[in-house]
């Protein structure tokens, strides 16, 4: 087996090890999630968006499904920083020392952005959508009778994607640090990125202009913010590269 094959096998073994660590931590977090599920469900049932909505179990398994969904979602949120760290640990051997330190700092930023995306969707977007749907049902003279599983499924469909979408600035920072993307590239594909974000917003929201704008505008601003972040990161990378080249010339001289 040549050196290239050994290197490939080493990468595969390292990837398996990182995945195993994530699985172990997820199982531990899932146990914690089983304890968190009930108080979280009780709290969200008492929230303003749910107080006036009669919730019913239309299937025998609905309470169990809701409970397990909350347990797994709680586990994912708890283990999210671990996932980010294991991803960083997998790629960090290929980075310079200063790059490793810089990218390690992205993990808490990414986690807080994830929580920020969840908060934006839950406290701003979700109440508006519930109000819009309730108003539409009233205008159409439709009696609202929601299942608890349907309500919380809709809640997760709105909130969880925003937690992921709010990772865009961190992903852009990381890719810029690795030299994969540049601010110029992000600007050149802006119109295509905007189109993709419009499509994503269309999948998340109901077919109504105001709710669509409430999702689309933050996503477009997030992309523009990512370009600015990429610009700052790119400048730092260029400066470090110049310093590295100067040090190399001095050593050669």
From Swiss-Prot:
It is a multi-pass membrane protein. Its main location: membrane. The keyword ATP-binding does not apply. The keyword Transmembrane helix applies. Keywords: Cell membrane, Membrane, Protein transport, Translocation, Transmembrane, Transmembrane helix, Transport. One of its GO terms (cellular component) is TAT protein transport complex. One of its GO terms (molecular function) is proton motive force dependent protein transmembrane transporter activity. The chain crosses the membrane at residues 19-39, 70-90, 109-129, 154-174, 194-214. It comes from the Bacteria. InterPro entries: Sec-indep_translocase_CS (IPR019820), TatC (IPR002033). It is found in: Cell membrane. Disulfide bonds: none annotated. GO terms for biological process: intracellular protein transmembrane transport; protein transport by the Tat complex. Belongs to the TatC family. Part of the twin-arginine translocation (Tat) system that transports large folded proteins containing a characteristic twin-arginine motif in their signal peptide across membranes. Forms a complex with TatA. This is Sec-independent protein translocase protein TatC. It comes from Halalkalibacterium halodurans (strain ATCC BAA-125 / DSM 18197 / FERM 7344 / JCM 9153 / C-125) (Bacillus halodurans).
